[in-house]
Amino acid sequence: MRRYDQSRHAKDVISARQIQLAWLERVLDSPDLVEADRDDPELVRHIGRIKEHGNRALRVAFNKSMGPVKIVTVYFDRKMKGRL
């Protein structure tokens, strides 16, 4: 498992959206899709399906330049429906 820290925002949305840390860690370690941020080369987005949550796509955005990586935000991405 990759080591990571969470921003205050990430902690808040994980709690509010009832996102399990196991899901976040799974997507962080084994994404179905990886996207670079076009404006910030330090930001990366990992996207993965969560079968236990209706096969929805979980998007995890993090700063890769920090050690450990810093989770910026996490959310279920409706725009990814049918794309993974």
What label would you give each PLM region?
Residues 1-84:
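Ribonuclease/tRNase effector modules and their secretory precursors
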